[in-house]
């Protein structure tokens, strides 16, 4: 098994605390509403949303995968940090054991925030992660972020 680490950052004009509430804590409800072209539904399979919770994320037609199952690994309300692992479905299978993801939302001096994202692809055997997988994951994250950001800008009273 190998581990391929990929780090990226994305900026937002939304303050860190507000973005954490919307994007992380209520993303299960918000994503299908604001980005139905990316996520059709999120279903809680097991748990209460904290560490150990298993969620099934279903994708609409046009996305190469029908679903993924993810496990919440950490929710840090103080430091705006969220960790989860994709453990089934999607790209996980013959070549990938799991994908561990960590998102940390950091406040910026101008009142916005930076999302620091660390993805660890745990491969099976000597398989390598394809550049297309990383690109697709980054594009999905960017789509969700911009959709949530647009929603929050249009609804100034939401998630305060």
Curated annotation (Swiss-Prot):
One of its GO terms (cellular component) is cytoplasm. GO terms for biological process: abscisic acid-activated signaling pathway; defense response. It comes from the Eukaryota. Signal peptide: none annotated. Brassinolide binds at residues 55, 82, 84, 101. GO terms for molecular function: abscisic acid binding; protein phosphatase inhibitor activity; signaling receptor activity. Keywords: Allergen, Cytoplasm, Pathogenesis-related protein, Plant defense. It is found in: Cytoplasm. Belongs to the BetVI family. May be a general steroid carrier protein. This is Major pollen allergen Bet v 1-E. It comes from Betula pendula (European white birch).
């Amino acid at each position: 098994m190998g581990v391929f680490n990929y780090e990226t950052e994305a900026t937002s004009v939304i303050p860190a605390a507000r973005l954490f509430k919307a994007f992380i804590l209520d993303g299960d409800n918000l994503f299908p509403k604001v980005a139905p072209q990316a996520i059709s539904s999120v279903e809680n399979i097991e748990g209460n949303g904290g560490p150990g919770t298993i969620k099934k994320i279903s994708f609409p037609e046009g996305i190469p995968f029908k679903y993924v199952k993810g496990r919440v690994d950490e929710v840090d309300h103080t430091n705006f940090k969220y960790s989860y692992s994709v453990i089934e479905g999607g790209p996980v299978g013959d070549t990938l054991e799991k994908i561990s993801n960590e998102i940390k939302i950091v406040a910026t001096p101008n009142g916005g925030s930076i999302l620091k994202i660390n993805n660890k692809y745990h491969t099976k055997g000597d398989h390598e992660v394809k550049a297309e997988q990383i690109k697709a994951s980054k594009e999905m994250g960017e789509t969700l972020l911009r959709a949530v950001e647009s929603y929050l800008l249009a609804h100034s009273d939401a998630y305060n």
